[in-house]
Structure formats: structure tokens, C-alpha cells
């Protein structure tokens, strides 16, 4: 470092002096002192007496114990663990526009799919707080996708590029761990937060053997999905069948409502790989190609409809075990997207 970095440790209002600050703040200050003369000048300053909010440069670094409150909002800050880790590992202190509390996501570029606006905002905030970058689009630089659906273009692209697809619980787990330990968000320790291959999918079958049906039920249930014995246009996402079952009632209903029809091997192979594989190699000949999993198109918006249990099967409900006649489907019940 050619120029000194001024590192100011802020004493919160509830503490009378630095001795009452958290152990982590004091350890971080000690780490800075060990580098005094090497480009770092550290000092303690009470929050209640600090008045300088203008004229600051990238050489002015503030360390606070909590990322909240008026003081936090007015300054760009780093956390004590961020300081300690940077000094221990001999890497530069972050100087970007966002506050950085830890460096658990340093070097990562994260995007999200299928989540609410509020969830995405929280992910963006936490990623920045952990030294990572957040993007609204999936690019060549993207390293991780956070999603709650396998029915999106981002998911398909992520699988094609072998990018990890994580649940939003990954963000919180890494955040909580990084407050206590010097960890890397890309570590295999967080593999249990990967998005299951059939996450939030409802799957049904038609015309396959009892043995194959039992296997499909088991794999779907164990890997984040839900198995249903009946087809219902508002909730069914995938119909699993053999090539000689294309005359079944469920198959006809799937065609009418644009649902994906695939071979049982799609379920088996996807479960083995740990991701929902593209459907192009598993699609039953003549079946719908509207699924984003096969053709990279926008997801069927009916996947987001509320799932309502009816006392009486609606007209767009097919349960072959009850010999429901497909002719009862009324055109006025058809979902129009």
C-alpha cells in the first residue's frame, strides 16, 4: 500500500468506550494495529461525536458492529470480520459503493429466478454485504443462480453451463456462518442448499408399469416434487408416460393444456444428476413442446396459480384410476395464457 488507509472503528451509542465494544471489533482493531506502519492507521471514534460525513475518500474506512441505523445509512462501511479476514489473507479491503460485512461471497456473481421482488432485494443486499456481486440477468460472469423453480430460462441456461443452482436458504446460511467464521459461500459445506431437481413440480404418470410408477413417485418425492395420481390443469406440471401411452386421457389433457410429456428416464436421470435435465431428449413423440425445460421458452404461467382442493373434481381434472372421461372437459374451463 502506497498511501495510508484510515480505518475508524465506530463505538456504538450503547458503549461508553472501546473496551465495551464486541470482542470481534476489538480483535479487528488489534489486527489493524499489527499492520500500523504498513499502510493502515486505525483509531476508535464514538458514534455520538462523529460529525464528518463529507470530504471522505476511498482511503477512509469505517468499521461498525451492526449494519443498521442512521450512521450506517450515511456512510459506506465494512464490518470487523471483513477487516480481519482481509488482513489475515493479505487481500485488499473492499472499496465498492456497497457496505461489506464479510467476504464470504467475494468473487461470486449471483442472479435469481422465480422469487418475489422482496426476496430478490434481500438476496441482493446480503450478497453485497458478503462482498459478492448481484446481477438481474444471467451472464457469462454468473457463478450461481438462486431459484425456487426449474421452469425458467435462467435455470435451463444454468444447467447447460453447470452452474450451481441454490435455494434462497443458501444466502441466509452463508450469511449466518460468515458472521462467526471465515468461510467461502462456494464451499461444498453448503451443498445441502442446492435446489432439488423437481423443486415445486407436481408430477403425474399414465400408462407405465406399477414398478416404474412406484419409482417415479419415490424419486419425485425425495427430490423436492409432489406426485399426484390425477391430472389437473392448474397444478400438474409434468406427465410421465411411455411412448405407447399417447392415447391415454392424461396425455390428451396434457396436450390440450400445454404440459410437458416425458419418458420415465427423465425422472431417473434428473434425480441421478441432481438437476432437472432439459426435456428435448426425453419428450414423448408428438407431445407438447411448450415447456421451457425443453425449448427454453417462457414458463407456463399456470404454474403460479393457487392450488385449490375441490370437493368435486373440476372439469379440467383427469384421474384415470377413476375412469374420468376426458370429454367432460369444458372448453370454457381451459386456462388461457
Where is each model-derived feature located?
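Eukaryotic intrinsically disordered, low-complexity regulatory regions
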Residues: 1-337
